[in-house]
Design a protein with these regions (language model features):
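A structural signal for multi-pass alpha-helical bundles of membrane permease subunits
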Residues: 2-218
Length: 220
């Protein structure tokens, strides 16, 4: 009986927290069903009435009048291309850093890690000018800019995992005649799957939710 009472209290607390977290999301959904003028005049947290109800007309207008599908496509392309580029380049970079123990690899590692503490706002104007000069100001090349900003976290995560990967497996593959690229793609990549998934989720959430960088750089 005492155990049941102890389990009820955390359940109640978590339920209240869940309701508080879900409530704004539900209100966003309800406000999307109101007429535009009612969103500000009737209050954000008020349920739509018969006078303010607009149904799915707002969604139809966003698709037909505001190029929502085009914007969604660009967001999808930028996110997928950026994440794929980050995963490929940073996993290879981390492999080099761990396996080639030299001054260059150490400098490269600390340079990537240091990039995590550099906010975009600090280099925003310079980067915008550079992106215009190098033609990195469109949805298909901005992924190179995202690679630069996302490399720090990705290299840091991949480096830690590669250090725990046994070198003997790679040496055995090299003895069997595998080239370095074959060792990387056929041996290391399958071992790195957990880290690849974790890094992909983090980078995808960051790129997808980012607004300031593409707003500053992209010219369509």
């Amino acid at each position: 009986m005492a155990d049941k009472k102890k389990s009820i209290i955390p359940t109640i607390i978590l339920s209240v927290i869940s309701i508080i977290w879900i409530y704004p999301i539900v209100m966003i959904l309800f406000n999307s069903l109101k007429v535009e003028s009612a969103i500000t005049t009737s209050g954000v947290f008020q349920f739509p009435t018969s006078e303010t109800w607009n149904g799915i007309q707002n969604f139809i207008a966003s698709v037909t009048q505001m190029d929502f599908l085009k914007s969604f496509w660009y967001s999808l392309v930028i996110s997928v291309m950026s994440v794929v580029l980050i995963l490929l380049c940073c996993s290879m970079c981390a492999w080099y850093i761990v396996r080639v123990n030299g001054l260059l690899s150490k400098v490269l590692y600390y340079l990537c890690v240091f990039s995590m503490v550099v906010p975009f706002q600090m280099v925003m104007f310079t980067l915008a000018k550079t992106a215009d000069t190098l033609k990195l100001n469109n949805p298909y090349t901005i992924c190179i800019v995202y690679l630069g900003f996302g490399a720090g976290l990705a290299v840091f995560m991949f480096t830690g995992f590669v250090k725990g990967s046994p070198l003997e497996i790679e040496e055995a593959a090299m003895i069997d005649g595998c080239s370095p690229l074959q060792v990387f793609f056929k041996i290391l990549i399958p071992i790195l799957k957990p880290t690849i998934i974790s890094t992909a989720i983090l980078e995808l959430m960051w790129v997808w939710n980012d607004y300031l960088l593409p707003l500053s750089l992209i010219h369509i």
